[in-house]
């Protein structure tokens, strides 16, 4: 609120606009971040901005699917694409899908609004379909790796919230993975720096789900490590300890945190997003 990138006022009344400008003046002393427009345009601006960011994410996730099938590395592609000043690096990180209280809701709301005026928004429909598929991707990779022999397998799950620095699990990719795994008879040993209370509330009556006091504890006797949220604590782990505690040195990385070549040298099987099957041969 106090450090907004921009302040958009939707009003059709000049007096109201003046009052709002005065209200926000302490937070906009240079008078360069406040934009006034009609109410309908302001409402649409909010939804359009979130839908556009969601579109960028889904576009890169679709490119990651193509990169994986062509044995290319989406992370190198991301750097190349983001270096174009017309595009930039914001919101082009491939991964296991977006979640939260804004992007999924706003994309669907904008699509529904379009239909009320007899317009079918094909791009918006594709954005959330790509995201839904991306959320299922980690479980698909796990299922393929174990040839559908999943019952009794234990997942060490790092990350529960839909993004770092929040305990919000609304529409989180972790929930899609957890539901699929528990339904298949697997067990989840989870760790998240702040979202475990929320996870325990959601899964308090679910057999097979447990939270652990630190990332290392979640690894004990697990068949694999799965990373869903890119918390800083996960970026530089003790790979030797991971290897010791897992039954098998295999990592499914939904956020592309690690260098595939380095993990291969350490003896891991590493399955990330859009990084090409050649890394595991």
Short names for language-model regions:
Residues 1-281:
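Structural/interface elements that position substrates and couple domains in central-metabolism enzymes
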